[in-house]
Amino acid sequence: GIRGLIQDIALRRGWGDVLAEGVKRAAARIPASEPYALHVKGLELPVRDPRAKWDTWTLGYLTNVRGGDHLRTRSPAEYLLRGTLGPLEEELGVSEEFVRGMDMPEGLKVAIFGEPPQRVSIPLMAKYAEELITLINAMGVCIRPPVLRTFGPELFGRMLEAVVGLRIRPEEVLLAAERIWNLQHLFNLREGLRREEFRLPDRFLREDNGNPPLEERTVEEALRRYSQARGWREDAVPLEEKIASLGLWEEASFL
């Protein structure tokens, strides 16, 4: 049964030795199994199905540096129970008053939420959420919705000032997070990552599960806008000016 299989995977016994490599590598060895290997960039997907709700969180399955991870692209303004407004926007899950009080640069708020705040730009929020969670990880804070909704670059700058005695502006804090994210992405590119791997399993694009399949053009348009926001080419390689602005020339020298 399942309990025995888990033990086989842990001890690499029999088929457990194959499955211990993860579903991507296992599917390459098990005939006709690839349609059932639900992963992005080799990481198995969490329980949330993007056919039910296409939003910042599910775009993050494609964009984040680990692959199909549910902890790197959580929006601080998500609305879990409502639908999507289109390939590029989702409904706002917090009040206008809450948005105005968020710890986020004002220009970024307008770009993501509009003025007055009415909706959420999925690609722009994906970039911001990734950098916010990068800060949370770097500062050793737990990633929970209350933290996402209350912590931001201003607070993190004050925390750093309290510890090291240096006043760090919110813009500098976000730039550091962007540098970390791009450094991880450059590592992946160096190790062979290609734009073609920013792709959901075909079943999400072909099969109806009570929700219609996602349209591939929806996914691709969101990815295109995300790459623009990141300062990347459409093949997911950072532009020279982005590399220069982040001081990552040495790390990007392999490109």
Task: Report each predicted region and the residues it spans.
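Extended C-terminal regions of large enzymes
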Residues: 1-255
